[in-house]
Each structure stands twice: as C-alpha cells, then as structure tokens.
Design a protein with these regions (language model features):
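Sec/Tat signal peptide C-region and signal peptidase I cleavage site
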Residues: 21-25
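Bacterial N-terminal signal peptides
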Residues: 10-19
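Bacterial N-terminal signal peptides that target proteins for export
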Residues: 1-11
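Interaction/scaffold regions that mediate signaling and macromolecular assembly across diverse proteins
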Residues: 26-158
Length: 158
C-alpha cells in the first residue's frame, strides 16, 4: 500500500510540474496604469511599412495554410533591417499617440521582438528552447525592449 501512495504522490507531482511551463507561457493579463496614457487629439501615425515589407519578404504560406517565417533565408543585413524597425519603435513616446496607433504599435513590436529573439538563437526547434534557466521555457520573461525608460518583456507587452 505504501508503494502505491508513493507512486500516486510522484504522479501528481510530475503532473503539476508538467503544467509549470504552460503557466509561464500564458500569464494572466494585467494592465499597467503606466500604459493607460494616450493622446486622443493626436493625429500622429506610426509608419509600419518597413515591418510590412520585411514580413512580405520572409513570411511564406505552407501547403497546410499556415504562414511561417523563412528564418533560414534571413541574412544579417535582413536582421539589421528588422532591428532598425524595432529601434524606431522603441524610440517613440508611445503615450503621445491615439489608442488605435498604440494597439498597432504594441502588436507589431511584440511580433518583431519575437522574431528577433528567435533569430538570435537560430537554429532551434521551438521558441521554448530559448531559456533563462532550468525552470523557464521560452523568452517571454526576458527584458527585450525599453519603452519610455521602462524595460519590458514579451509578457509585459502582451
């Protein structure tokens, strides 16, 4: 009977540990008051054409209908273009824009940073292979960008 209890306890522990990476990959959304600032009167727009052009070059549709980034075709010059786009976004004072501009900004910044971190570690089988340590899976908690003086992770942006 003792052996069955130990096996059951071990099974439960392994099951719970198996969910740990999933909990990290999908954190609970929490909005920071810091990012509630916006300018409803702003007529300024953010130029995402460099990102659009970059994606048009490197995103391919698979036979299964899923779009994928052709990481193996990206050169150092192409990555430099991506970094230039990211740098142009991080240089902006995002609080000065309307909400719709902010939304596009955060979505595009998140995606560009994600591709950039994959390129930094390429080749790899999964983004989860990018790790900060034993109990981390993926780059979501790495400080990847500084916006208005605030160092942010992909989790923060999400």
């Amino acid at each position: 009977m003792q052996i069955w209890r130990q096996l059951a306890a071990t099974g439960v522990a392994l099951l719970l540990l198996g969910y740990y990476p999933l909990a990290q990959a999908a954190p609970a959304a929490k909005l920071w008051d810091r990012w509630n600032a916006f300018n409803p009167a702003s007529s300024a727009t953010i130029d995402h054409r460099p990102w659009h052009n970059w994606l048009e070059t490197f995103v391919v549709s698979g036979a299964d209908g899923i779009n994928r980034v052709a990481y193996n075709q990206i050169t150092e010059a192409d990555r430099a273009r991506l970094r230039t786009y990211i740098d142009s976004l991080t240089a902006l004072s995002i609080s000065d824009f309307k909400r719709n501009q902010q939304r596009a900004y955060w979505i595009n910044l998140y995606n560009a940073l994600t591709i950039d971190i994959v390129l930094e570690h390429f080749p790899l089988n999964s983004i989860r292979d990018i790790s900060r340590g034993l109990f981390s899976s993926g780059p979501w908690r790495l400080k990847l960008a500084t916006i208005e003086g605030e160092a942010l992770t992909l989790d923060d942006i999400e």
